[in-house]
Structures are given as C-alpha cells and as structure tokens.
Amino acid sequence: MATFDHPFLPNAGPPIRKMMLDAIGVASIEELYSDIPAQVRTNHPLKVDWLPSEQEVKSHLERVLAENKSASDMPIFLGGGIYNHYLPAAVKAILGRTEFQTSYTPYQAEISQGLLQSLFEFQSMIADLTQMDAVNSSLYDGSTALGEAARMASRATGRKKILVPRSLHPAKLSVLKNYTEPAGIGLETFMYDKETGGVSSADLQSKVDRDTAAVYCEVPSFFGILDQEVANVPSICHSRGALSIVGFDPISLGGLKPPGEYGADIVIAEGQSISTEMNFGGPALGIIGCRGENLIRQLPGRLIGMTTTLDGKEKAFSMVLQTREQHIRREKATSNICTNEALFAIGAAAYLSLLGPKGLRQLFESILVKTSYAIKMLSELPGVVVPRFTSPHYQEFVASFKGTKGTLARLNKSLLSNGVHGGKSLVKDFPELGESALFCVTETHSAEAIDKLRLLIEKLQEA
C-alpha cells in the first residue's frame, strides 16, 4: 500500500508522483519545471511562522469574518444598481431545490420538463408585466442585457448609432461600450433636463436621425426619477425609423404603466431585486424582451415555448428558439451567451407568483412612500438640497450637500463609523452635480432607520 507524505494531498507521495511523471514522459520534477527560468524561481523554503491546527484556523477566520458588516447589521442607503430587498423564505427554498440549483440549462433540455415549465412561467410573467410579445429565459445581468439590446437594434435596423442618457449608470455604460465597439456601433449621449432630471426632449430630438438604430431610456432612471417624458420617446424614435429601448425596474411595474403600452420595442432590466440577494454585487439576472417577429428572431439566448407531446395528448415544453452560437452556425447566431441565469429566472418566477399583482402593487407603493418620507426628512436639514431634481422619485434620489460643511467623502466615512451606510457619491461620475450623493430606500428601510440617517447628518453638520 502506498504511503502518503501529506494528509490532504495523497498524490504528493513519492510512488504516486513517480507514476505521474512516467505517464507524461518526464524524469523528474526539475525537468517538469525546466521551462521556468531559474532566476524567477523561489530557491528556499517558504517562511511560515504559524502552523495552526484546524481548530485554530477556524477560530482565526471567524475573527476576521466578524469584522464584516452586512445589511442586517446596519441600514444601507447605497443603491445604484444592486438593491437590498426582502427575499421571501419560499423563494430561497425554491432556489435551493436540487431540481433547480444550477444556472445551467441541460443540453437534453426536454427531459427536464419541470425546469422548462418554470422558465416558461418566468417568460410569461415578465411579458405580461412589460406588455411584450416575447421574453427570453434570461441573460447575465441588466448591463449585458442592454448590450444585447443595442446589438439587436443595430441588426434589425442596419444602423450603427445608439443614443443613451447622460444619467446612465457609469458601469452600465462601460459594459455597453464593450458590446458595441467591436460591432462598429457608436454611442452618443443626450442630456437630462437640469431642473427635472428627466429626458431633455429638445436635446434628444436634435440627435435622433436616420443613422440612429435606437434610443435607450430608463424608468426609473439612475437618479431614481419617474420621468413622464419617456412615454413620448418611442414616437420620436419611430418617426425617424429608430427603435425604442426602455430599461425598467420589475417591482416598479406593480404601479407604473408597462413600457409596451407606450410603444417600447425592446425592454431590459436588472432582475436581482426579485430573484436573489445583493451577494456583493452579483451574480444577478438579466431580463430582455421585445415586440414583433423581426425582433423576436434577433433575441439572444433561448426561448422556451409550450407545445404538446408527440401523440398530442399532453402539454409539453421545449426550446423553440436557440440563437446562441453553440447551437447554430456562428455567423447566424445573435449572441455568444453561454450558461445563463436560469436559476435566478426561476427565483423571479417564484417571487412574482408569491406576491401576485396586488402584492406587487403594495410593495411598489410601500417603496414610494418610504422614498418620499426619506426625501422629506433630509430636506429639513440646513444646507442639504433634497431632492436635487423636481420630478417624482422612486427608490432613489439625489441629495446635494453643497451647502454643508466638509466633503461628501468625509460625511460617508462618519456615517459608516456610526453604523449607517450612506449614499453613493456622484462627485466623480457626475461632477456637474457637485457634492451630491444617490440615496436608496426600499421596503427594508424602517422609519427609524431613516430618522437615524437624518439625525446623524444633522449632528455631523454641527460637529
């Protein structure tokens, strides 16, 4: 029987090591590493002062982890794309089911009828929410969904210009550039109205031309603005042969008009808020849908459809469109998306099923009320301008600290040391807004947490 030199690495024993070297035709470890120059190798034993037991390692790691602070330890007013919503226990239980706990769609997918039906239900619910003809079975996240939408629009129109708002999340813009630049698609920015924070219709209309493939708008915007002007954008686009892409927040459609009702051609969203927790920023859930057969055939990824068994006696589900490059000729594919976010799509279906239309509306109204309460509380502070813009806000709002003492960075640091995570600084990405921050409020924020934020800012101003 072979003897092992290491309790956790049985292959480190000399007999097994020799067998492996013989199998690859190498005489020694030295010969195996001969391609690595001697001057860059470590030629002395590593100095390891601490050789702990398993118990000591566990205790050490627990002490290190105890220094972390989670959303359950302090109120977090940081949003900007990933949000602290309450995820029902039933959704977590479904996500943990062994039948679902993989983001991978089986290659013999029709064997997994339960998985396909769950994805079909997800597609159907999002299509109903948005009033789109088709929704795919998920993309990586909201940013990549926007990238795919831009390429869809360019293919469908044969044009090479996409208009995006100046208020677009900088990280989302960066991902969008990664998708458009290799395809020769140019991006142009249209401004937001300095008073309302919404779309500047005059600036937009001056930039939509016969080279424009699509215009992208968001409701709510990155600034949290519920912009009524977005409803007029599709008609502006269509009058010039362009498409309208609208970004939405799934929970907000519990109370807002669906994008399909005012003419959006393609919709995209980040579905993290209805499918999974913050998870340090990912993984998330990309949502994309569209109207019209021409655009449906340009959708990336997979579509799950409902059909019948061969004998026609039972309902069944199958993949009806698979335009990924692994399934069809590469030059005919719409995208190289591989493993998608099927697990979180199922989580979203479970979430929407649990809440239903009435529950989703109640949640939307709750967030709306708490957002208004936070705005009211902060607006009472001297030197703080809240909201920075006059439009209605949902879940997020911009606060200007131009009239207060000190910098926003100092304020956020002080808030954190007092057990509150402040808003996202906009100083670097939106210098035209001065010392401003984006604050986020969801159903998880109590009135006491909002009051604590106000009180701390007030005390820090007096210090």
Regions inferred by a protein language model and the residue ranges of each:
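Active-site C-terminal subdomain of aminotransferase-like
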Residues: I274-P382, P387-T390
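N-terminal entrance/gating region of PLP-dependent enzymes' catalytic architecture
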Residues: S34-E121, I328
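Charged, compositionally biased N-terminal leader segments and the immediate start
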Residues: M1-I16, M20, E314
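Conserved C-terminal alpha-helix-loop-beta "cap" of PLP-dependent enzymes
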Residues: K358-K452
